[in-house]
Amino acid sequence: MSNSQSSICNSPGTAKRLDTLVAKIRACTLCPKMHRPAVSGGAVVSRVMSIGQAPGVKEPILGRPFAWTAGKTLYGWFTAACGWSEADFRARVYMAAVCRCFPGKTKAGGDRVPDPGEIETCSRWLADEIEILCPALVLPIGKLAILQLIQFEKLTDVIGKKFRVTKHGHEFDVIPLPHPSGASPWHRMEPGKSLLTRALKLIVKHEAWPGV
C-alpha cells in the first residue's frame, strides 16, 4: 500500500464511513433464503481483517461472529500464539465474512453452504470494507473464505503460507487459517496441526499485527 493510500484509509472519516457501512450490513434483506438478522463484529477500524464463512445458528441470537464453540477454538489459537483474549481479538481485528446471515440447515441437519448467488450478493460488503479499511493483513478462515481470495485444491497448499493478493483495487497480505469447527479434525491432526502453528507464527510476526 502506498503512503497516500494508507493516509486516506486512516483519515478521520474512516470510522464514520465504517459505522455507516456496518449499519447497512445489519439492515440488509437482499437474500430471501437467508435467516436474518445479518451479523457484524462492529465498526472496528483496523489494519487487520478476518473473513469468516457465514454465521451459525447461535451467532444471530448473540449478535456477533464466532460467538459459539468454533469461536472459542479460534480465540484459543490466538491466546496460545500471542496472549490475546477473545475481547482483544474482537477489539483489534475487523471481522468480516463471506455471507453475513445464517444460511439455515440442510435436510441432513448440517449448516447449509451459501449458494453462489448469495456469495455474490454479499461480496459487495467485503468490497466496501476493503475500500474503506485498506487492510494490510487479511485472515480468511475456512475453505469458503480462502477461496474468495486464493484458488487452491487442498488446505495443505495454503495453510502456513503468506500470499500477496490484490482484491477490489487494493493489495494486501493474506494468511489463511483452517476453520475452527469442532466437526473438522483437520486442525487437530498432522500435518494440519503443524501448519496451523506455522500460520499463527506468520500472523503475529506480521508488521501490521503489533500495532493492531
Region roles according to the model:
Residues 4-6:
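Intrinsically disordered, low-complexity proline-rich regions
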Residues 10-211:
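A polyanion-binding, active-site-adjacent surface
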